Curated annotation (Swiss-Prot):
Protein name per its UniProtKB record: DNA-directed RNA polymerase subunit beta'
Record-listed Zn(2+) 1 binding positions: 70, 72, 85, 88
InterPro entries from the UniProt entry: DNA-dir_RpoC_beta_prime (IPR045867), DNA-dir_RpoC_beta_prime_bact (IPR012754), RNA_pol_asu (IPR000722), RNA_pol_N (IPR006592), RNA_pol_Rpb1_1 (IPR007080), RNA_pol_Rpb1_3 (IPR007066), RNA_pol_Rpb1_3_sf (IPR042102), RNA_pol_Rpb1_4 (IPR007083)
Domain of life the protein comes from: Bacteria
Entry's cofactor comment: Binds 1 Mg(2+) ion per subunit.
Catalytic activity: RNA(n) + a ribonucleoside 5'-triphosphate = RNA(n+1) + diphosphate
SMART domains, A to Z: RPOLA_N (SM00663)
Gene name for this UniProt entry: rpoC
Matches recorded under Pfam families: RNA_pol_Rpb1_1, RNA_pol_Rpb1_2, RNA_pol_Rpb1_3, RNA_pol_Rpb1_4, RNA_pol_Rpb1_5
Entry EC number(s): 2.7.7.6
Keywords from the named record: DNA-directed RNA polymerase, Magnesium, Metal-binding, Nucleotidyltransferase, Transcription, Transferase, Zinc
Native organism: Cellvibrio japonicus (strain Ueda107)
Metal-binding as UniProt keyword: yes
């Protein structure tokens, strides 16, 4: 009995481990795992179904087929446990040992492991310093390799063909040795002395000048060091013994009809064994060399196929022409071991069904069909039935449940009470896709879902299905209730705004009841209290929308929680009073006393959560919903065709637009405007017409004229159903109403360019055939886009989660005082995001001081909450330095001060919060809402008619920001820089508006001038790109030959001639090399220089440019030399939507990036090469640069427009040539903060366009993970190699140690890695391997003998432990503490202690 108990105890024990190591297996190790050698290719006997002896399923090697039974049947049952049968040699034990016992195959000739050979970079190749081609020629018996040169002229590792080998034999006899095949490779690897090689390379690297050589050496050095330190031996990459997988992991299952279903591995193993046995026989027979060689090659190929089929040559196929699934295929890919079984598992105790709406539920409830509940809670019911004595055995209980006896239902009610269940809707894009509810039993078969959680699940009731899961353990129930309950998830973790917000019909009801109607029944009545109002309303004495006065009490809650009440008489409507009755105390009346559109309702719920508290908010949200449904039913709003009133002005507007278009067509016909200009202008006209129609239509729908009490006509907001739907935010938008009642407007072709002829009809009038055909393009593209988008968005989320999964809040405070400077986002005349919104929920890094004094306004370490935001807005502060995840100095994880507020809870983030995963989900979840399309410039024109001037909105002072200007004779400024901006500051000096000023714009004000609202301060022609002269002088042409490089055109109407530069493609061969340009000369014909420089005033003219001046004309400063039609100058596609977000996170370099100044200094131009210009920057202080030169130079293609002139001063990181920014350059030249700002702003732009709110800190969290690695620039006394990529934390740790010992620390440069690269470069090989490129990651990890400390979430999921985040953090901290205690207590244990412990254990086990 004791035996049995011990056996059971040993079965249940879990091994505790702290890390996992992966390394190469030596032949001895493989033999030690093995339980015997597999010698025959047979599997099982097809008559008796018994495994063949010494075959692939042999019971002697792998264990018995049936529990406690040997193969021949001599020993059966438990009592013979552990005996080895003398007849058949099988140990009597559990059959499940066939899942863990391995065998082996002794190979007759060594075989190279294909992973270390072919997975790039080839490890064997690096080690032997040979190319992969050469090694393959040796391995597959095409040439000899010299393994021991002896005293000859040959070198070790030299390849010899057959002829060369025989010649060498004749010449040197047996002075030297040359071999072929894997043995040769093995011999070469044995000969390597790791230590001396490492020493040699370490000395060689500093003495090498060529970059490529250093790269090669440091790669090889890294590999050699890895072998040296990990204890792996290089020759183990060639196998002499092949392990055999346990048979139950490659099963052979008999099907009916005498056929077998088998794992592909068995076929692959059979080939290996067959070839191996044949090779053994050939060697015994001393067969001719050529035959043996062929057999060895075939063995090598068979083993290759077993390990990784298809990696080399053609994949071996089975009987059905399908490639066989090798060991490598088992672990990689979506269906592989990692992603299918370790990271994604099926869940027991779950069910799924269609969802229907449950408008009567409370927020924390869901309706669960009785049938489902009975099935899901079966074990609980069984135990209750037994406990009550209603059933004697489980079997009897089962019977009762199957018969559905009455008592079972009573027990089910009890079991379910206060037992939450989890509801999940696929796709689970963020953590709100799984929430906990208390089940309410219902009849029927559909799950009832509370309407307010639909937006979190993104669910609708058109046939969606949801899954139910039952948390079994008490801990799971507790977590479900405390963390996952729908009532605890009011705020969205992405933006911190409420996500439990009424939508659609509820909004419509609340909006309708809070509207005013002039001259409704009971208008002007005065009531004593709210009760009287509802009595009057329900007895039909007063209308719901009537304006009345009522006396009510308003309670307000201050910042410290103190309550103040005030009773007053207020002007309001009946509906608003009814709504006021359900509003919790503490909410001001003015939040309710207005038409409740969706935004207003959201604001009330948000305020309620922040000020009144969670419980009140939940109750309030529920009551809002009930009331909304009630009144939307009473409103009886519906749509008829006549609700879409077509504006009277429409015909007139369209006629005017048509006339304008005709005008432009005639201009085009007579050659006054180019094709591109015509296209742009036409589209502009129609965009404007469309907007006008829409405006007049909305004016018609949104207002109605009524007679008021005094019999006078008065305008009020209309009660048109369509208008109410759109205005309340319930459904539809002005853009959709425009298509129904205005005009459909311009349509896009499938490639995104806009068709010139708009659809003038609307849906109420109906489309004709042509119009319908045009509009099908867009509809189809929309559907195709959606399908592609979903997959792309899912992949982006997966990469984001993978890169950020191990980022958890571990510390309270890392103590840093660095951070990011936050300022408001201003575009054009609007503040898009105020400073308050940006810093809400952040911690201030340093004291904010009032400008011009030393008064501290906000002390460092303050968490900015809503109250502080109000104060900061009043103080007129322009920017605040806040702590950020990017600058957090915690070694692993992140501290809660740098992260700030937990957005979903509204207080400071708790240690253990998995902020990385939350960030990834918040960015990935709205991915499906982003567009896939790339906007062409034409598309941009359609979105807004092209801007051609800057009109100021409010009064203020002008600030010109990095604009270079020249002033023309009229005294106006002309902008000659491309990235200039003009800002307007208000009286207190805060920036309120900001506009981009394009090249060639006329600026009519000076810097610092005061302007009034509505004043136009700059204007330009939006359809052409000018080239502006910066000096006055005489025009001299060069490279302008008529008919070769230019074409003269004379206008019939005006008689003016213009010159057009031909595109090189259109020129005759003689003109191909001409470079048309204009030089400005003085009266004597000498070249003029640009002001204060020695750069000639020389303008290259691009193709398609149009000149209106002639050779010898005299021009002034600021005059336009040439115009380039806008479509002619290179229009860059603006990548929008999802691809743009992916590009930013992958840190991709754009095609033609902006060129930045690498150092600060003076610009000059060197000798030009063909097609390139040489830009030279000389440091002003004359210091010598790192590489020893006195200046920095870069070659820039001629077609790039430069923004700097000779002699100009540039600062490091300033733009020299325009283009999209390259994030790597920003990091290198401007630092981490500039990079963070760039990436955050760019990504926010994309999301903002779609109206998605995401908090900046999620993006910063991902950027932190992208900045984990550094590149070593100088080694110092560290163990790092120059040019090596290392984790930042490990460099910091090593440098600390070196400084403590007074040695030289290593210097490094921060690196920016794309999210895919960063995921693959994590410390943890388990996490990287389960992400992508499994083979490569595992190969590298094995060679370097990597140890995975299981720090992240993914690794712990894979090994099946609690994750070190959330509630699992306590378990991990506890284990850490126990480990430390154990280390400190490792003092000897006496024999008596052991004995006492044993007796104690036995006692407890017997009892």
């Amino acid at each position: 009995m004791k035996d049995l108990l011990n056996l059971l105890k040993s079965q249940g024990q879990v091994e505790e481990f702290d890390s996992i190591r992966i390394s190469l297996a030596s032949p001895e190790m493989i033999r030690s795992w093995s339980f015997g050698e597999v010698k025959k290719p047979e599997t099982i006997n097809y008559r008796t179904f018994k495994p063949e002896r010494e075959g692939l399923f042999c019971a002697k090697i792998f264990g018995p087929v049936k529990d406690y039974e040997c193969l021949c049947g001599k020993y059966k049952r438990m009592k013979h446990r552990g005996i080895i049968c003398e007849k058949c040699g099988v140990e009597v034990t559990l059959a499940k040992v066939r899942r863990e016992r391995m065998g082996h195959i002794e190979l007759a000739s060594p075989v190279a492991h294909i992973w270390f050979l072919k997975s790039l970079p080839s490890r064997i190749g690096l080690l032997l310093d040979m190319t992969l081609r050469d090694i393959e020629r040796v391995l597959y018996f095409e040439s000899y390799v010299v393994t021991e040169p002896g005293m000859t002229t040959l070198e070790r590792g030299q390849l010899l063909t057959d002829e060369q080998y025989f010649e060498a034999m004749e010449e040197f006899g047996d002075e030297f040795e040359a071999q072929m095949g894997a043995e040769a490779i093995q011999t070469l690897m044995r000969a390597i002395d790791l230590e001396t090689e490492v020493q040699r390379l370490r000395e060689e690297i500093p003495n090498t000048s060529s970059e490529t050589k250093i790269k090669k050496y440091s790669k090889r050095l890294k590999l050699l060091e890895a072998f040296h330190f990990s204890g792996n031996k290089p020759e183990w990459m060639v196998m002499e013994v092949l392990p055999v997988l346990p048979p139950d992991l490659r099963p052979l299952v008999p099907l009916d009809g005498g056929r077998f279903a088998t794992s592909d591995l068995n076929d692959l193993y059979r080939r290996v064994i067959n070839r191996n046995n044949r090779l053994k026989r050939l060697l015994d027979l001393n067969a001719p060399d050529i035959i043996v060689r062929n057999e060895k090659r075939m063995l090598q190929e068979a083993v290759d196929a077993l390990l990784d089929n298809g990696r080399r040559g053609r994949a071996i196929t089975g009987s059905n022409k399908r490639p066989l699934k090798s060991l490598a295929d088992m672990i990689k890919g979506k269906q592989g071991r990692f992603r299918q079984n370790l990271l994604g598992k099926r869940v027991d105790y779950s069910g799924r069904s269609v969802i229907v709406v449950g408008p009567t539920l409370r927020l924390h409830q869901c309706g669960l069909p009785k049938k489902m509940a009975l099935e899901l809670f079966k074990p609980f019911i069984f135990s209750k039935l037994e406990l009550r004595g209603l059933a004697t055995t489980i079997k009897a209980a089962k019977k009762m449940v199957e018969r559905e006896e009455a008592v079972v239902w009573d027990i089910l009610d009890e079991v379910i009470r206060e037992h939450p269940v989890l509801l999940n809707r696929a796709p689970t894009l963020h953590r709100l896709g799984i929430q906990a509810f208390e089940p309410v039993l219902i009849e029927g078969k559909a799950i009832q879902l509370h309407p307010l959680v639909c937006s979190a699940y993104n669910a609708d009731f058109d046939g969606d299905q949801m899954a139910v899961h039952v948390p079994l353990t008490i801990e799971a129930q507790l977590e479900a209730r405390a963390l996952m309950m729908s009532t605890n998830n009011i705020l969205s973790p992405a933006s911190g705004e409420p996500i439990i917000v009424p939508s659609q019909d509820v909004v419509l009801g609340l909006y309708w009841m809070t509207r005013e109607r002039i001259n409704a029944k009971g208008e002007g009545m005065v009531f004593a209290d709210t009760m009287e109002v509802s009595r009057a309303y329900y007895s039909k004495q007063v209308d719901l929308q009537a304006r009345i006065k009522v006396r009510l009490t308003e309670t307000l809650i201050g910042a410290e929680g103190e309550r103040t009440s005030e009773t007053k008489l207020v002007q309001t409507t009946v509906g608003r009073v009814l709504l006021w009755e359900i509003v919790p105390a503490g909410i001001p009346l003015e939040m309710i006393n207005r038409p409740m559109v969706k935004k207003a309702i959201s604001a009330v719920i948000n305020y309620c959560y922040r000020v009144v508290g969670l419980k009140a908010t939940v109750i309030f949200a529920d009551r809002l919903m009930y009331m909304g449904y009630d009144f939307s039913t009473k409103s009886g709003s519906s749509i008829g065709v006549n609700d879409f009133t077509i504006p009277a002005a429409k015909a007139d507007i369209i006629a005017r637009a048509d006339a304008e278009v005709k005008e432009i067509e005639t201009q085009y016909a007579s050659g006054l405007v180019t094709q591109g200009e015509k296209y742009n202008k036409v589209i502009d006209i129609w965009s404007r017409a469309n907007d006008l129609v829409a405006k007049s239509m909305m004016e018609g729908i949104s207002k109605e004229t009524v007679i008021n009490r005094d019999g006078v006509e008065e305008q009020q907001s209309s009660f048109n159903s369509v208008f109410m739907y759109a205005d309340s935010g319930a459904r539809g938008s002005p853009a959709q109403i425009r298509q129904l009642a205005g005009m459909r407007g311009l349509m896009a072709r499938p490639d995104g360019s806009i068709i010139e002829t708009p659809i003038k009809a609307n849906f109420r009038e109906g489309l004709n055939v042509l119009q319908y055909f045009i509009s099908t393009h867009g509809a189809r593209k929309g559907l195709a886009d959606t399908a592609l988008k979903t997959a792309n968005s899912g992949y982006l989320t997966r990469r984001l989660v993978d890169v950020a999964q191990d980022l958890v809040v571990t510390l309270q405070d890392c103590g840093t005082d660095s951070g990011l400077t936050m300022s408001p986002v201003i575009e054009g005349g609007d503040v898009i995001e105020s400073l308050g919104d940006r810093i809400l929920g952040r911690v201030v890094a340093r004291d904010v001081i009032r400008p011009g004094s030393d008064e501290i306004l906000v002390p460092a370490g303050t968490m900015i909450d809503e109250a502080w935001v109000g104060r900061i807005e009043e103080m007129g502060i322009d920017e605040v330095l806040v702590r950020s995840p990017i600058t957090c100095e915690s070694r692993n994880g992140i501290c809660s001060m740098c992260y700030g507020r937990d957005l979903a809870r509204g207080h400071r983030v708790n240690p253990g919060e998995a902020v990385g995963v939350i960030a990834a989900q918040s960015i990935g979840e709205p991915g499906t809402q982003l567009t896939m399309r790339t906007f062409h410039i034409g598309g941009a024109a359609s979105r807004a008619s092209a801007a051609d001037s800057v009109q100021v909105k409010q009064e203020g002072t002008v600030r010109l920001l990095n604009v270079k200007v020249v002033s023309n004779p009229a005294g106006n400024l002309v902008a000659v820089s491309r990235s200039g901006e003009l800002a307007i500051a208000d009286a207190s000096g805060r920036e309120r508006e900001r506009y981009k000023i394009p090249y060639g714009a006329l600026i009519t004000v000076k810097d610092g001038e005061t302007v009034k609202g509505g004043q136009i301060v700059a204007k330009w022609d939006p359809h052409t790109h000018p080239i502006v002269s910066e000096v006055a002088g005489t025009v001299a042409f060069s490279g302008m030959e008529e008919g070769l490089s230019i074409r003269r055109q004379t206008d019939e109407l005006t008689g003016l001639s213009s010159i057009e530069i031909l595109d090189p493609a259109e020129r005759p061969s003689a003109g191909k090399d001409l470079r048309p340009a204009i030089t400005l000369v003085d009266a004597k014909g000498k070249e003029l220089f640009l002001a204060n420089t020695n750069v000639p005033a020389h303008y290259m003219l691009p193709a398609k440019a149009i000149l209106t001046i002639n050779n010898g004309d005299i021009i002034n400063v600021g005059d336009i030399v040439a115009r380039i039609p806008q479509e002619g100058s290179k229009t860059r596609d603006i990548t929008g939507g999802l691809p743009r977000v992916a590009d930013l996170f992958e840190a991709r370099r754009p095609k033609e990036p902006a060129i930045l100044a690498e150092i600060s200094g003076t610009v000059s131009f060197g000798k030009e090469t063909k097609g390139k210009r040489r830009l030279i920057i000389t440091p002003t202080d004359g210091q010598v640069l790192d590489d020893g030169s006195t200046h920095y130079e870069v070659l820039i293609p001629k077609h790039r427009q430069l923004t700097v002139f000779e002699g100009e001063m540039v600062a490091k990181g300033e733009v020299v040539s325009d283009g999209p920014a390259n994030p790597h350059d920003i990091l290198r030249l401007q630092g981490v903060e500039a990079l963070a700002r760039y990436i955050t702003n760019e990504i926010q732009d994309v999301y903002r366009l779609q109206g998605v709110k995401i908090n900046d800190k999620h993006i910063e969290t991902i950027v932190r993970q992208m900045l984990r690695k550094v590149e070593i620039t100088t080694m110092g006394d560290s163990s790092f190699v120059k040019g090596e990529q290392v984790e930042l934390t490990s460099v910091l740790e090593e440098n600390e140690k070196l400084r403590a010992e007074g040695k030289q620390p290593a210097h490094y440069e921060r690196l920016l890695l794309g999210i895919t690269k960063a995921s693959l470069a994590t410390e943890s090989f388990i996490s990287a391997a389960s992400f992508q490129e499994t083979t490569r990651v595992l190969t590298e990890a094995a060679v370097t003998g990597k140890k995975d400390n299981l720090r992240g979430l993914k690794e712990n999921v894979v090994v099946g432990r609690l994750i070190p985040a959330g509630t699992g953090l306590a378990y991990h901290n506890d284990r850490k503490r126990r480990r430390e205690e154990a280390l400190s207590e490792q003092v000897g244990v006496s024999a008596e202690d052991v004995e006492a412990a044993l007796t104690e254990a036995l006692k407890s086990s017997v009892s």
